[in-house]
Curated annotation (Swiss-Prot):
Monomer. Thrombin-like enzyme that induces quick formation of fibrin clots. Only degrades the Aalpha-chain of fibrinogen (FGA). GO terms for molecular function: serine-type peptidase activity; toxin activity. It is found in: Secreted. Its main location: secreted. It is an enzyme of class 3 (hydrolase). This is Thrombin-like enzyme D-V. Keywords: Blood coagulation cascade activating toxin, Disulfide bond, Glycoprotein, Hemostasis impairing toxin, Hydrolase, Protease, Secreted, Serine protease, Toxin.
Length: 10
C-alpha cells in the first residue's frame, strides 16, 4: 500500500 503507514493484515 503506497502512502499508507497503518496497513493491518489479519
Amino acid at each position: 500500500v503506497v502512502g499508507a503507514d497503518n496497513c493491518n493484515f489479519n
